[in-house]
Amino acid sequence: MVDFKSIETFLWVVTLGSFRGAGQRLNTTQPAISQRIAQLEREMGVKLLNRDHRVVSPTPSGRQLMLYAEKLISLRAEMMAEIGDRSAMRGVLRLGVAETIVHTWLPQLIKSVNTAHPNLSLEIEVDITPDLSTRLLAQEIDLAFLVGPLSASGVRNRVLCDYPIGILASPSLGLGNRTLKVQDLAKFPIITFPRRSQPYEIVRSLFNRPGLSPIRLHASASLATVIHMAVEGLGIAVIPASIVENELADGRLQLLSTDLKIPPLTFSASWLESPDMLAVERVVDLAAKIAQGSAVIADASDVDAPRSVVQF
């Protein structure tokens, strides 16, 4: 009798092109994957996979089986969504996260997932959006929260929230009592997101103007480092103000009023289409609800205003 687990294993071997990838996806060993495939081929009585090349590919019989495997996995996900107990969902979900989310609502999401799906484990990796995009398309992660949406074949997106970019500095710099022009800001080192990130390129272009001397642009992959440098008065930070609410509240940083127009960062959940997307979609639903309640501060005039809620 054909085992459902063997069908699922076959689907992921074909989808990922390797036994190793399927093992990582299903949180098991490569020998266990090989054993399941061998058992499935014995029960079906045909060869299902070509193993002669670096990338495993389905035989003609394997391609036929793949059509049924996708239907079966999809039906199982539909059945679990309609009938199954949410707490019964189990497995490992590989989540890639941009650091801005780490500093805002990721802890709340983890708590919500633990409560709603106690048997679902999250493997969390923090990286910049370009690398998260690459890893998602390579199927090394199942879900990414990144600056998006991501435009690529087979990718599904859901916008989560917008974070306006703030111009922030230590009060020790004495910049908080007037509206600053770009020439005023350019006199100080500018501290922001790492190279290859969208915010870095935006900041670089804003200060790349005729008649303006080259700025000292400090880029860091660690937002904690950016915040620390700004608090110490080492420069002006250009980051979302929402991630430094504590520093703003206790006076270690202040939000500067400027004539710069910087577009907000739009964060989205991005994942690949798959017959088995139930766990991903449940986590995305939780993330959307939490992100929708994130506070945003646009500029210095908003510091004393009531919190606004990001709407979809």
Regions found by a protein language model. Give the residues of each.
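N-terminal helix-turn-helix
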Residues: 1-67, 101
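Short helix-loop hinge/linker segments at domain boundaries
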Residues: 46-48, 52-56, 63-64, 74-96, ...
